[in-house]
Amino acid sequence: MRIFAVFIFMTYWHLLNAFTVTVPKDLYVVEYGSNMTIECKFPVEKQLDLAALIVYWEMEDKNIIQFVHGEEDLKVQHSSYRQRARLLKDQLSLGNAALQITDVKLQDAGVYRCMISYGGADYKRITVKVNAPYNKINQRILVVDPVTSEHELTCQAEGYPKAEVIWTSSDHQVLSGKTTTTNSKREEKLFNVTSTLRINTTTNEIFYCTFRRLDPEENHTAELVIPELPLAHPPNERTHLVILGAILLCLGVALTFIFRLRKGRMMDVKKCGIQDTNSKKQSDTHLEET
């Protein structure tokens, strides 16, 4: 505010010099997270004399740029603009005091003042509005009850200002969903809007969730297509391995049993053969004695 008071004095002091600052636009509407450049024009004849130029940019009570006699003083820059705001010095020779702000925040909205002294002095106001659209909509579809084919549809997005969510079917019927609004964890002023719809439906049916914001008026819509119901017990690689292991185990047990059974039979046959031989020998011996 002290800088602004000094410039008012300088403006009246140099009125006779007819030094005038102009602005190509006095209103900028920019998107959250984007980069913006706002401009103030001042008269330059022939070659620019940096030693005679003073440029100030401020927003309400925040100092953004203080450029005096060819040097920029970053020590006075407000902390919220550090590493984000800069004066485009290559534009000064063209009579353009352009302020560039990167990664625009919601708190960057407000009234900016450019104050320029160059032989004379003048200032202009520029209004900046920040728009945070609900254009990145996350969606989810869950099966609540496979028997009744009840599904839970969810849409979630962040933006500013607040928005309502309207659910519609493919035949444009408006449906009743439940919407909750909380503050975003990314930035204090952003709203996190989540809406849920529970409905009995069938495969390939289409539903729409629309985020409607009134000021400024803007709509963003996401399409949700109902997928096929999953199998009650979907096969997977682990199941296949378990089944294969069980089959191999059973096969191993069966082969072992068969092998032992055959071995036992062979032993019985061999024993029978030995017994027959012994019996025959005993018979022959008995005959010889007789």
Swiss-Prot record:
Residue ranges annotated for the Ig-like C2-type domain, each copy included: 133-225
Gene3D superfamilies in UniProt: Immunoglobulins
Signal peptide coordinates: 1-18
Disulfide bridge partners, by residue number: C40-C114, C155-C209
Side Extracellular, residues: 19-238
Topology feature Cytoplasmic, residues: 260-290
Domain Ig-like V-type: start-end pairs: 19-127
Membrane topology, as annotated: Single-pass type I membrane protein
UniProt PTM: Ubiquitinated; STUB1 likely mediates polyubiquitination of PD-L1/CD274 triggering its degradation. Ubiquitinated by MARCHF8; leading to degradation. Deubiquitinated by USP22; leading to stabilization.
Subunit structure: Interacts with PDCD1. Interacts (via transmembrane domain) with CMTM4 and CMTM6. Interacts with (phosphorylated) STAT3; promoting nuclear translocation. Interacts with CD80.
Family recorded in the similarity comment: Belongs to the immunoglobulin superfamily. BTN/MOG family.
Protein name: Programmed cell death 1 ligand 1
Source species of the chain: Homo sapiens (Human)
Biological classification of the source: Eukaryota, Metazoa, Chordata, Craniata, Vertebrata
